[in-house]
Regions:
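Active-site nucleophile loop of the alpha/beta-hydrolase fold
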Residues: 2, 32-35, 90-100
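Gly/Ala-rich beta-loop-alpha elbow adjacent to hydrolase catalytic centers
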Residues: 65-75
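Active-site catalytic motif of lipid deacylating hydrolases and related acyltransferases
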Residues: 1-60, 164
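Catalytic histidine neighborhood in serine/cysteine hydrolases
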Residues: 24-28, 150-166
């Protein structure tokens, strides 16, 4: 999850975690420390620990769903080789524009360098399948999600009117996400 997120009731991530657990899936949905003033090393450490625990569940598909600043956290994890085993699928939802995160008060660390030539190879090393999705009206992506296409060498999906996929943007249940978990078809993510 992202900056200032405390896993609120009604948020699509929390609702999806509950739905998937009810269906019998193993779900990790940790609260990252200090969401108002995230410290990159602490977020990376928790991401590493949670990923390693996922590796302890044999025979299960390993899927990461990251939102907002959580997408930046996952990409830094991939760049830093903090994972033990690759993810079968990674979904980056509403990745923020690094220019915006660098200007936001309370977000520590260097902004993601989208020109880093290692970004795409490292992301592909740790994600067997990588999907990026964003809204066409995301306040955290004033230049549009297209800035991630050359950086990650993947064409992002655009969901019209999705905003930042937040409660403020009217995001609650996301049936398409549950469908994608089951099918693996990125097109399912466009279902609201």
């Amino acid at each position: 999850h992202g900056w200032t997120n405390r896993r609120p009731e009604g948020h699509w991530m929390r609702l999806s975690a509950a739905t998937l657990r009810a269906q019998g899936h193993h779900v990790w949905y940790p609260q990252f420390p200090d969401p108002d003033t995230p410290k990159p090393l602490e977020w990376q450490d928790l991401l590493r620990q949670e990923s390693n625990m996922m590796d302890e569940v044999p025979g299960e598909e390993k899927i990461c769903i990251a939102h907002s600043l959580g997408t930046t956290n996952w990409l830094y994890g991939a760049l830093g080789d903090i994972f033990t085993e690759p993810f079968d699928r990674v979904l980056l939802v509403a990745p923020p524009d690094p220019q915006m995160t660098s200007e936001a008060e309370g977000i520590e660390g260097e902004p993601m360098d989208l020109s880093n030539p290692l970004l795409a190879p490292q992301a592909k090393k740790w994600a067997k399948s990588l999907t990026v999705i964003a809204g066409d009206n995301d306040r955290w992506l004033p230049r549009g999600v297209g800035i991630y296409e050359p950086a990650l060498e993947t064409e992002p999906l655009i969901l019209p009117g999705a905003g930042h996929f937040s409660l403020d943007d009217g995001w609650g249940r996301w049936p398409g996400l549950i469908s994608w978990i089951e099918s693996g078809d990125p097109g399912d993510l466009l279902e609201r």
